[in-house]
Amino acid sequence: MKEIGLEGHGISPNAVSEPFRLFTDEAVQQIRAEVFSEEVLKDCRFASTFNKQMVRGMGPARAPFTYAAWNSPELLAAVSKVAGIDVVPSFDFEVANINISVNSGGKPVTEPKKDDGNPLSDGLSSVAWHYDSFPFVCVVMLSDCTDMVGGETALRTSSGEIMKVRGPAMGTAVVLQGRYIEHQALKALGGRERISMVTCFRPKSPHVRDETVLTGVRGISHKSEMYTQYTEYRLEILEERIRAKQKSERTRVAARRPFDTEEIRQWLNEQKAFIESTLEEMTGE
């Protein structure tokens, strides 16, 4: 974050990673089999202005391998190490978002356009500039990128400059602190298909600031299911914070330290803000 002028922003000093291996080719094929199963395609397809073909909310029943993989201790340790903070999937509906683009007439592109110094001069932006709804995202490529050119992520620094981050190859991942960095995806040219898998993450500790919003996913979700999972995890965070505060208060009493009115008022106001931010996301739209 310091290198792009955003030191102190977000919940981790790490902004974005280079691609790293996260899934084997065999694991990718198993995930693809679940994504393109009849049940998933029937119940879990969505579209938005960003992407006309998405699969979301597969859940453990329809996609047991995908769900188990993203919740495995080994994968969580790998993603947390790259993120620079312990993270967990935001909630089940975000395991995972599959973006599907198929070009039946696609011709391989072997030579990229000349770089004239403007990273976006070719006009090949795939998604508009935006901030993510969740603190971190992990993007995994599920397609063979051999004949593809492009597909990078463009980041806007605090000075307004544009940086490009190389996109992942099949089975590799890129981790981005997208809630706090303005970014956009650039189009990939060549190849018959481009299928990417995006899983959203939040801090594991209930005591770390969590500024998750539902703005970007409310219109592409089964709301009852999503709101149930969102409410559950927010209440769990609140419960753990209250239990921790109760424990610290008992310790204070046992040590015969005086009651700190200002400290407890500050803590209560923090929980009030947390509840109010949760309420703001629970819209009827």
Predicted region positions:
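N-terminal accessory alpha/beta regions
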Residues: 2-13
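A short beta-loop-beta micro-motif enriched in histidine and acidic residues
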Residues: 93, 123-135, 161-162, 168-169
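Conserved short histidine dyad/triad with adjacent acidic residue
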Residues: 98-130
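Short, conserved beta-strand element in jelly-roll/cupin
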Residues: 128-148, 200-203
